């Protein structure tokens, strides 16, 4: 082995041994979960008493509030995006208390998104108020990644809503209190309160309660 490389390797081994046995390493290992939780909480506008599982992805989390007692499971993505025309991020995502957001769920907004109390989602759910570009010929001639991201309408979800695995909530819709969204559904229009909906696009399967 090259003498210089050997010297570098020996130095690295000594440094690694020192760090592994140091008080700093032991402290970080003992407190890694607490430090991870605190790091994420400080990113958000509000996130007191929220449980974050591993590998949470955020963007501009200062525009996002998460209510007390909520739980974001592994690999949840939650992002707020700036207005590409003004350069200002005036997005506002509010998730009320008691939300339980399933693994790999993606919540994203450029405008205002309000999610009521006690939301329950399955895995791989998408909730979005935006899309890449529009359907004009000029935009369609661009690569999708180069089309300007724009909000298509605010999303509002009421209290005690249950959204099944792999459902997609598209821009501009309101979902009423107590609604149940079946797995694999695509929500393109408003959903009545206390109804069960499913399909692509969704239709009302059952009305559970008359308002």
What are the residue ranges of the model-derived segments?
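Domain-scale signature associated with acetyltransferase and cell-envelope carbohydrate enzymes
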Residues: 1-129, 154, 158-160, 169, ...
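Conserved coupling/switch loop of ABC ATPases
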Residues: 171, 189
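Active-site/ligand-binding-proximal alpha/beta "capping" segment
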Residues: 174
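A generic "structured core" feature
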Residues: 162, 180-182, 186
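A short acidic, glycine-rich active-site loop
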Residues: 143-155
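Short, flexible, mixed-charge acidic loops at enzyme active sites
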Residues: 133-143
């Amino acid at each position: 082995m090259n003498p210089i490389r050997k010297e570098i390797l020996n130095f690295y081994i000594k440094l690694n041994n020192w760090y592994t046995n140091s008080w700093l390493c032991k402290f970080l290992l003992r407190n890694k979960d607490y430090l991870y939780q605190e790091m994420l909480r400080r990113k958000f506008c509000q996130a007191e008493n929220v449980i974050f599982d591993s590998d949470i992805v955020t963007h501009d989390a200062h525009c996002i509030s998460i209510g007390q007692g909520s739980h974001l499971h592994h690999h949840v993505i939650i992002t707020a995006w700036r207005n590409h025309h003004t350069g200002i991020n005036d997005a506002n995502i509010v998730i009320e208390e008691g939300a339980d957001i399933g693994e790999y769920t993606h919540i994203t907004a450029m405008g205002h998104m309000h999610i009521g109390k006690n939301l329950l989602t399955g895995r791989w759910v998408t909730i979005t108020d935006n899309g890449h570009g529009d359907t004009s010929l000029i935009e369609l001639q661009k690569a999708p990644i180069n089309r300007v991201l724009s909000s298509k309408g605010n999303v509002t979800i009421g209290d005690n809503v249950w959204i099944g695995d792999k459902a997609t909530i598209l821009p501009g819709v309101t979902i009423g209190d107590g609604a149940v969204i079946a797995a694999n559904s695509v929500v393109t229009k408003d959903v009545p309160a206390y109804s069960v909906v499913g399909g692509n696009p969704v239709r009302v399967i059952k009305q559970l309660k008359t308002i």
